[in-house]
């Protein structure tokens, strides 16, 4: 099931980031951070009252953050753009205002935009850290967005009330027959890299279309095909009409749409335009895939449009590897969606990555492996002179593969030794195209790297 997307909107300095961090900080995954992603987290999964959802810092998504020193007119324009983007892309909206500042013209302007949507809007009055401030929240009834809920994101006061109201609008977690397990591939990338052309080429190559399920104006379009007798769902993020007028540039490319596709897939095909080379946006999207712990294949498209000599392929491959060194496990495939060159290989690569994600190493074999690699390279501790021992290992889950190593003190394990173990695991067992997660647990408590 696709998690609902909840967008946080509001003026600068009203406490959006504090509220966002409080929500995300309440729930830690097995491994919170992975190497290779240095950007700020603009989104994350959380849950409340049995409802799981993805919360998004809309200002960060649209503008890479916010600058309160901008001219007032520019701040107003950006804040309004947040609201328009949220209306177009999110399933629900949390509109945060500042109880200390009181009602401002910019708040009213955003409210005018939000009242045009039928999507649920929760009005949260932040910085109400006293009884007097909470009473002042009634001023925001004037926005005609329902009952204003006082809260203090910094202290955590009232945040539960905001989430209680929000989850009234979110559907309970259910599963349908269409969600039976099979390979799901998301086609992602910047605008105009050939996502739709690739999808059309994949659909046109000796495969029968089982079903074509159109999404809403917010959802990617799913097309299920059969390939070698197995169903494969292709999730396309291109060519989807958007409701409402969005800021230029955002019209063509939606982070939320890409997030939704990545969250639902097993393997992402990240398209790179060979005529333009690797861009920062390409690596940013790869970072999304890493953070979601999904399989990844780097697809260099428009290879037919490049003038080549005997060194071109290797030089471009080196360029891609250098730019994406934080996903050095991802295969690189050079294709042309226009001519069909090597496109037929992509589904085979994706099927293999899917198999690698499901691979499980028996515990006895894993511990033989651990003894062997420790003989080659004893465990390294972060503290000089500290005594570190690794006792045994298990693989508690797949998709992605997670390896749990028990130590006398998990805090002592140096990050480079985690990398060493990952490299040795990949050398021995493959895991091509999928992240693997290394977790260290002390005998007394769990510690993660």
From Swiss-Prot:
<dbReference type="InterPro" id="IPR015946">
    <property type="entry name" value="KH_dom-like_a/b"/>
</dbReference>
<dbReference type="GO" id="GO:0016887">
    <property type="term" value="F:ATP hydrolysis activity"/>
</dbReference>
<protein>
    <recommendedName>
        <fullName>GTPase Der</fullName>
    </recommendedName>
</protein>
<keyword id="KW-0547">Nucleotide-binding</keyword>
<feature type="binding site">
    <location>
        <begin position="189"/>
        <end position="196"/>
    </location>
    <ligand>
        <name>GTP 2</name>
    </ligand>
</feature>
<comment type="function">
    <text>GTPase that plays an essential role in the late steps of ribosome biogenesis.</text>
</comment>
<feature type="binding site">
    <location>
        <begin position="301"/>
        <end position="304"/>
    </location>
    <ligand>
        <name>GTP 2</name>
    </ligand>
</feature>
<feature type="domain" description="KH-like">
    <location>
        <begin position="359"/>
        <end position="444"/>
    </location>
</feature>
<dbReference type="Pfam" id="PF01926">
    <property type="entry name" value="MMR_HSR1"/>
</dbReference>
<feature type="domain" description="EngA-type G 2">
    <location>
        <begin position="183"/>
        <end position="358"/>
    </location>
</feature>
<dbReference type="InterPro" id="IPR032859">
    <property type="entry name" value="KH_dom-like"/>
</dbReference>
<feature type="binding site">
    <location>
        <begin position="236"/>
        <end position="240"/>
    </location>
    <ligand>
        <name>GTP 2</name>
    </ligand>
</feature>
<dbReference type="InterPro" id="IPR006073">
    <property type="entry name" value="GTP-bd"/>
</dbReference>
<feature type="binding site">
    <location>
        <begin position="10"/>
        <end position="17"/>
    </location>
    <ligand>
        <name>GTP 1</name>
    </ligand>
</feature>
<keyword id="KW-0342">GTP-binding</keyword>
<comment type="similarity">
    <text>Belongs to the TRAFAC class TrmE-Era-EngA-EngB-Septin-like GTPase superfamily. EngA (Der) GTPase family.</text>
</comment>
<dbReference type="GO" id="GO:0043022">
    <property type="term" value="F:ribosome binding"/>
</dbReference>
<keyword id="KW-0690">Ribosome biogenesis</keyword>
<dbReference type="InterPro" id="IPR027417">
    <property type="entry name" value="P-loop_NTPase"/>
</dbReference>
<dbReference type="InterPro" id="IPR005225">
    <property type="entry name" value="Small_GTP-bd"/>
</dbReference>
<feature type="domain" description="EngA-type G 1">
    <location>
        <begin position="4"/>
        <end position="174"/>
    </location>
</feature>
<dbReference type="GO" id="GO:0042254">
    <property type="term" value="P:ribosome biogenesis"/>
</dbReference>
<comment type="subunit">
    <text>Associates with the 50S ribosomal subunit.</text>
</comment>
<dbReference type="Pfam" id="PF14714">
    <property type="entry name" value="KH_dom-like"/>
</dbReference>
<keyword id="KW-0677">Repeat</keyword>
<dbReference type="InterPro" id="IPR003593">
    <property type="entry name" value="AAA+_ATPase"/>
</dbReference>
<feature type="binding site">
    <location>
        <begin position="126"/>
        <end position="129"/>
    </location>
    <ligand>
        <name>GTP 1</name>
    </ligand>
</feature>
<feature type="binding site">
    <location>
        <begin position="57"/>
        <end position="61"/>
    </location>
    <ligand>
        <name>GTP 1</name>
    </ligand>
</feature>
<dbReference type="InterPro" id="IPR016484">
    <property type="entry name" value="GTPase_Der"/>
</dbReference>
<dbReference type="InterPro" id="IPR031166">
    <property type="entry name" value="G_ENGA"/>
</dbReference>
<dbReference type="GO" id="GO:0005525">
    <property type="term" value="F:GTP binding"/>
</dbReference>
């Amino acid at each position: 099931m696709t998690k609902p997307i909840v967008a946080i909107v509001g003026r600068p300095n009203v406490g959006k980031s504090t509220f966002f961090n409080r929500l995300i900080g309440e729930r830690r995954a097995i491994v919170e951070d992975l190497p290779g992603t240095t950007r700020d987290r603009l989104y994350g999964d959380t849950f409340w009252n049995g409802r799981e959802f993805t919360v998004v810092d809309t200002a960060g998504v649209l503008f890479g953050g916010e600058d309160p020193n901008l001219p007032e007119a520019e701040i107003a324009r950006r804040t309004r753009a947040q609201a328009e983007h949220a209306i177009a892309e999110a399933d629900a909206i949390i509109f945060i205002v500042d109880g200390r500042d009181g009602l401002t013209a910019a708040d009213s302007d955003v409210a005018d935009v939000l009242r045009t949507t039928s999507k649920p809007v929760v009005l949260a009055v932040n910085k109400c850290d006293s009884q007097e401030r909470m009473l002042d929240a009634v001023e925001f009834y004037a926005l005609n967005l329902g009952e204003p809920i006082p809260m203090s994101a910094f202290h955590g006061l009232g945040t539960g009330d905001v989430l209680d109201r929000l989850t009234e609008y979110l559907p309970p977690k259910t599963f349908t027959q269409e969600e039976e397990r099979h390979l799901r591939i998301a086609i992602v990338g910047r605008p105009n890299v050939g996502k739709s052309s690739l999808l059309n080429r994949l659909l046109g190559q000796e495969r029968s279309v089982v079903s074509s399920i159109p999404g809403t104006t917010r959802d990617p379009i799913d097309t299920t095909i059969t390939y070698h007798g197995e169903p494969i769902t292709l999730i396309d993020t291109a060519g989807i009409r958007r409701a409402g007028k969005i800021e230029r540039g955002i019209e063509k490319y939606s982070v939320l749409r890409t997030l939704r596709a990545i969250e639902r897939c097993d393997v992402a095909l990240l398209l790179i335009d060979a005529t333009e080379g690797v861009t920062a946006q390409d690596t940013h999207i790869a970072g999304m895939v890493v953070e979601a712990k999904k399989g990844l294949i780097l697809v260099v498209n428009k290879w037919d449009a490049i003038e080549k000599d005997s060194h071109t392929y290797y030089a471009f491959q080196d360029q891609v590897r250098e730019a994406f060194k934080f996903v050095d496990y991802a295969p690189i495939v050079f294709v042309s969606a226009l001519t069909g060159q090597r496109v037929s290989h992509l589904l085979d690569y994706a099927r293999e990555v899917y198999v690698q994600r499901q691979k499980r190493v028996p515990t006895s074999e894993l511990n033989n492996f651990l003894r062997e690699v420790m003989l080659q390279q004893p465990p390294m501790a972060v503290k000089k002179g500290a005594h570190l021992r690794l006792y045994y290992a298990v693989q508690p889950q797949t998709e992605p593969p997670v390896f749990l190593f028990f130590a006398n003190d998990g805090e002592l394990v140096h990050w480079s030794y985690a990398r060493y173990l990952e490299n040795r695991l990949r050398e021995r067992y493959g895991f091509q195209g999928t992240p693997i997660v290394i977790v260290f647990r002390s005998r007394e408590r769990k510690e993660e790297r």
